[in-house]
Swiss-Prot record:
This is Putative stoned B-like protein. A motif (DPF 2) lies at residues 1006-1008. SUPFAM superfamilies: Second domain of Mu2 adaptin subunit (ap50) of ap2 adaptor. One of its GO terms (cellular component) is AP-2 adaptor complex. Residues 1287-1606 form the MHD domain.
Amino acid sequence: MSWRDRDFDPHGGRNAFRLTDESKQSSSERAASMRAMRSFTQSIEDEGPPELPASLDIDMIEGVSMKTSDTNDTIIEVKPGKVDPQLGETQKYKMAVPGPGHSEQEQELHKSLIRDEEEDAEVEQVFAASAEPVVTPPKSLNFAETAEELRHAYDQKIRKRPTTPTSACVLDGIAFFAGSVDGSNDTIPTDAEKKIKVSIPSGRRRKTENMSYSEFYESMANQIPGGGGRRMSQSGRTTPLHDYEGDILDENPQYKDKAPPAPVVHRRSSIEWENFADMEDKMEQAEEKARKEEKKEKEETAEVAQNDDVTTEKHQNEVEKSKKMLNFLAKPPTVEITSPDAPHQGAFHDNTPKEPKVVEEEEDDDLPTFSEDMDEARQQVMKEMTESVVKTENVENEKQEDTHISEGHVEYGTEESPAVTDGSYQQDGTENAYDPNAYPGYIWNYETQEWEYDPSYVAPEEPIDQSAYEAQAAAYAEVDQRAAEVVYQREHAGYDQGDFYTHQDTSYSSEAYAHDQAKGYQDPNAYGAEAAADNSQEYDYSAYGGYEGYLAACRAYDEESQQPQYGETVATEAYSQDYGYEQQGDYHHEGVGATDENSTSAISGYEQNGASTSLGYGDAQGYDGYDHNASYYQGQEYQQEYYQNHKYENSQYQVDQHPAESAAPPRPVAPMEPLFKQAPPQPDPFGWDSSGHTGDAPTASEPVQELSPTPEASSSTGTSAPARPPPARPEAPKKDETAVDAAAPPRPPPAARPPPPRPAPANKEKPKEPEPEEDAWAQFKRMTEKVSTAVKSTESTLKNLEETSAANDIKDESYLANVGGSQGFVNESTQKEIQRLTEEKKMEKLQKKKLKQQGKKAATPTLEPDEEDAMDRAAQELAMKMASMRSDMADWKAPEMIPVKEIKKAPEIRRVDSASAIPPRKRSSIKDVQQDSGGSLELPPHLAAPQDSIAPNPKGDHAPDDPILSAPAWADFETSEPMLPPSESGFFSNKDASNEGGVSRDATDDPFVTTVASSEKRSSFVADPFAPQQAALIDESYDPFAVVAVEEVVAMAKAKAEQAAANAENEDDFYNGRQSPTLSTPTPEGGSPISQQRPNAFEDDFKCAELTGLDTPTPLYDEDDSQPLTDFIPKFDGDGWDLMVRHPIKKKSFMAERCWKPCYVRLHGLTLYLYNDKKDAQPIQELLLQATYSLSDTTLQAYDVYGKIHTVKLQFVVYKEKVGIRPGQISRLVDGHITKYGLPLEHSAQCTVLLKFGSLNASHLQTFVTTVEDLLFKCKITRTAKPVYKQDEVQIHCYDEYSAFVDKEGILSDQKARVRLFCLAFLTGSPVLEVGLNDRRRQGKEIVRRKDILPMYTERWIRFEALEFHSIVNKPEFDKEQVIAFSPPDGCFFEIMRFRVRPPRNREKAMTVKSIMKIAGSKVEIRIEAMAAAQIQRTRGSDERRNIPCEDIAIRFPIPEAWIYLFREERHWGVGSIHSKKLRPGKVKNLKDRLLGAVQASEPNLIECAIGEAKYEHVYRSLVWRIPRLPEKHHAAYKSHLLKCRFELSSFDLMPEEFLPRCDVDFTMPLATVSNTVVRSVSVEQHEDSDRVEKFVRYVAKYQYKVEIDYVQCADLDLDMADPSVNPEAAAAPVPELHQPTFNPSTQESDTQQGYRIDFNEAEMGGSNRRDDSSSDEEPDSHKMPIIQIDMKNYGY
């Protein structure tokens, strides 16, 4: 078998050098084997440095892996990915989901949407250019994915042959974290105080210059930002830094005498790669360079400590370059606090969340991935490690305490628990075989089975200055006392923000601070993780909510390092702004270093709530008000108690404490944190409060203070200052303050007793060092973080204000200045009555709540007014001081504070107003109202007056110092409900119409104290129209200088009551409207007590809506059903119809012409038969009618040169879904309602015309249309298809059809109306439609989802009669529930049901048409007046009304045939009708010309109309006036429009013996105004997504009036027939005789003359041609033009 056909063996290269039987080989043989494998690997890797893949550009690393990775990605041979048969093309990948929390969620992506790794590299590289420092909302980070993704991206490109697998890739260390080198990425390790002492191996760092990859990796390191807190787990035997050419046991004397406890089995199943030998030279050179740098660092540490200077970014980068270069291979075992949802799993762990474990189990949380045989050996080692840990705990505990204290590392807040000491791991030479994940900075050597100090391990932070690296070097050097001193120097002497306690790898142990968090240090939230977070610690990104949040905090932290030091920004700016952390009152900042299940207590301790004076740390008082370092010095129990009970006592520092008002308070020494930590409690991935900005806050929360070893410092350490009030806002440090000494202070007392904090030494004012250049995007990100935090703070503040604001009690509809709104016209007394009831309920709730609270805690002691006033002032001063110390609260104005004990009361007091102060009990009189108007529960004591002073005093006579008139009461929204100022409308002129003589109160009256009502001394107060009548307190506080006499108020009240009654009588809506008084009026009872009855003209939104349509004089239907309903359209009983059909039926070619061919149509059953002639036996075509067929609307189409023809199409319509917009969707698109596919979709109709019929007789054709519609309605159909639509849609069409006769007087008769319901549905699957109508049988019994209710004013219920249903409708369901349920056929416009209604008899006509023909001798005038009535439509829930117009109006006035020629004119193409001139009647035409006499009088127009167009239409034999719409847009209803047609008959014109009696009026209205039918709901059941179904309802009312024509003979056409008194002389003139033609047919013989008559042949009249063939020899004889004959005898129409 060819090697190409075999599966690729990633271990083939190194297996060639491996012994066959590994269990029998000695350690030397294994070492030789490994060296051979390393040599093999090096030979592969040394072929040339590859180009750095774009995916390794750390600028683009966000700490978030976009997909998981496995070993298959690392091999060279790339094969097509196998599709999981279960998942198909949709595979699950980890994706970063944007949004608060940025939690990782599994998204299902189709294969086509998944990017390849090459695509990832390019895209991410481009992205990295603009987002170098990733500062995004906090999110948990899975480091295994990050490492794997980067490693695979690199390995795939450079690996030419398989290399040996191992735990870490070369690039993993570098690419692991964005920002591991670049100083601009200011990431701070979570545990700034965590320390693990490490000693660098004796051999110097090697192979930096000589190594072939050195330049490559140096350049690569330059690109990589500082990697804060790497989470790589050391899972390999070694790293390039430990790839010694000789046996490691021989080279490292520390392990010389130690033998591995068990044989090391090579991890053959490892999925990870490492190049064993390619880094040996680099190791040597790097270690050598590192040692040199360590010396420099040590020398510079003292310098840094004295000058308090931060080393330049350049030097930082250089140091970090070298260290990171050595570091990037090693994945040191990290002790981290990982959130349960994103536990630390080493570099390449599975992404399986682990629950938080106890300290002993925390080891397994970070286990690296081992092969099976390796894992067994590892378990054995772990067992020994655990035993050794237990044995050495107590010993190390003591040693650790001494060591830490001697080094100046006082473990604050700890009680020297074993976890603290062991976790600190600062004992020299500690070599316990601990869990690989437990010791950052250590590497597990699998040859020696020992821990080796990892010289490549670098604290994951950004700009760590030289002092930081000195401490690092010291920490990694041989762990002796000197190293400890160096660490101390770095930490205490020169601790500027640049130091960051860099290499105290103490990662706050959850044992020390989190395990017993309630007792000590209260979670980093109390203070710890921020201030004490050691940048070198493995960061718990969960505390930040993610790596990005961590970066943000670190960057902010580092920026602070560039500030003139902590003292300058003191707890406000440095801590709030520069750390990217806004002191937000609502944020519970989870600490970075150690978190625990007790973090909630810490949260209370570290709640940046400026209003809480009992917070433990970082409140608005900054560091002055409270030594936040005290949490470190105190015992765990004591510290918890301190946070809860102490109120920023400054007892923690004495010497430098009080000067700290100008200088920053002391920064506590970072407590040593044990290595074993517990995972923090599960953070809310979307909670910005706990893990969102907490990440920023912890590092930012408190800048690490530099601890002075001066005697002052030590003395202050031993003593505590007395408590004093909160200090003023801290100022910048003064220049003359003492410099920081590098010497270690005297050893403080053990931490068994909480020692006082170290006062901060005076920091010299040093020149501000230039901040490291930061990418603009990073700055923007950080600023965005600040802004978002500020926004959160503002939102919380606004939320509190919203809850407590008196504006809540101002009803929007009560602003009567804007006339309108549902409450705009409510009587004042009515409004007050409503509000009184509402506020009583509110007070009941408030009292229940208060009683409930009082049951839980002791009742608040009653205080005297003076005492409470003093407490208010003191609290306000305290709040002002607290605000003054916070830079972010510079613009904050302290609210009116009350003591903390009563903080629960504040919202209630804010809400207490005239309404809410009413006790929850009913009152029967105004006396009770005034006596009990307050209850005095909520009145602030400074407003409460003595109860004994009840002497009456007229309004306006109050003394200036009256509490009622004092400033708090005048503009106090806490104790009064805001009112509008007195207005001209008189809203405030009457307190109560029923309170004509109110109880007058003295200036010192407590308005809530019951008083005796004296009727003779009652005075009416200015009324608050928004408050209930009972609240007299508020009324007195407004307009106190307006004194209104009682008589005036009573008179005004009575006048307003009468006006309200009059308005109520006069204001009747035209159509089914609600009665709304135009003004807010008092109760008509005048001075009577408040009536519990509803007063006259009562109007509110709570009125029973169903009465709206019943109390109007116009009912919705005629209730008299004694007479049976007649057929709406009489049944057709003829044999068939003489019609015309368009021939040929199917067009043969595009250019072919078709003509109208006479035919005869019969209907038998559902079959339509088409004959050439009525006498034919065989039809020329048969057509079976189906339910999917439909008839078009009847239209007019050109027929010949004289006129048009009525046509109708029998068609089959197919709908196709395509992109487009139909008229109904435009408004929805404007509102943003777009389909789920992002494009507007319409279902366009594609019509297939089966037959097209025409007729010159409109009524004849209408009978045919009606008959066919009846047949289609009875056709049966079922839903068979189950289509799939991108956009589902349901259309319901409701057609009202109405006909009536109107006589000359305008009286309606012979009304008929019916309703037809059509449906057109495009629904996926086989759903069921349920249509609910306003059937009165269904009133009050509707059960329908809210989403299915259609937005119509539907409080109208009508009676259905003569119901007919389509066969598809579930008839029993309708009989039971009155719901039309059916499964609609797909894409079929069909009629669901039809029913009859009885229109009311006295209803106003929608359009009034009056037609008159005046005949004055030979002069004739046709006069038509049209006027549209006001049809009002109102939307439910609002008072908005709009007129419903009449549209497509056609008024047809019949013209005798003898006069037709008068309306015709010859044109160049034939004969046409004379069109009307649009002239408004009553205007003088050509006035200017007439005055000048320049032009003769113009010829009179034949037809003049004010609107629309009029002309003679031969198909109707009528003068047709067409109007598009009445009333016109922006025009009012009831406006009369006139058409005049004047002509004079000649001597040849005949006068008809009789005229047609009526004219026709047709029009439509866009709502169902005839029947008032309303589709209340459309429900789609059994549908996959009924919420996405678009629903449309179209209402059309089709009216047809037969209006009687008034024929009048008069003396003059200008005579006003309606009012003859206008021109009595003309009216009295004799009426001339009727016109007589010159040739009288009655006297002439028929042979001589014949009257004018147009003869139509049989075909023209709708009959069949005499010849079937169009091409006949006798064609010249056939008359194409009608013949005009004269027949005077039988003249008629």
